[in-house]
Amino acid sequence: MAELLKGAPVARALTEELAARCAALRERGVVPTSAIVRVGEREDDLSYERGALKRCEKVGIEARRVLLPADVSQDELLAVIEDINTDSSVHGCLMFRPLPAGLDEDAVAAALDPAKDVDSMTPASLLTTLSGRGEGFAPCTAEAVLALLDHYGVELDGAKVAVVGRSLVIGRPVAAMLTARNATVTTCHTHTRDLAAECRAADIVVAAVGRAHTIGVDAIREDQTIIDVGINWDEAAGKLVGDVDFDAAEPVVNAITPVPGGVGAVTTAILAKHVIEAAERASK
């Protein structure tokens, strides 16, 4: 029976530390503030927004929601970003992605001030994550993966890791961050010839493809640690599930994150951490 790597204890520890740092900033007259920009009403965006608002409240961060219709124009969205850039009381900006069709996400990302980019949306922040140079913030979910592994004492130095997924939001950043911690990382994707074999060879598997049950019983073995980043709705089961077949993996592997209740809880805590750090930098 696998150890469940639950996100709540990790998030709770981070929240306690961040609340103290937030209180110290407020004593100096600095109110850490995050702008949360949502275009449209995608269910996963709404879910993340609820979690982010709760986390900000617990830490003491002021959250300002900017809610835009799905048919907002490119110019209108860019104007919102410019307002955030020039508002010195706003320290961080979270914008839910992907944006609706018709909007140029790359142009919007490039318009945001990197100092306020708390989820690695801008090219400058991504460069920091992938190169290890600079002061940009890593993607919250990617950093949450490492925070969770560290909290539970999972050894990364020299470990073989299979990262399944190569998106710029999770896959590539988490692979770079794990490599920086001296893990030996294999990035798997749709053209990987034998995905199951690559996963079986790994000590740690990070599943981040956004497709339910991508990692099945043929891809796991004993003594592995499984980090399931996926959040998918299983119509047949009527519940949220990850990218890993949890029922097949949990009796076999050494440790696994549940979905829900795993990485997601830590992601909002990392978001709060980035907002606090941005406020600390801006107030120096």
Predicted feature descriptions by range:
Residues V39-L53, G136-T225, V229, D234-E250:
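Glycine-rich phosphate/diphosphate-binding loop of Rossmann-like nucleotide-binding domains
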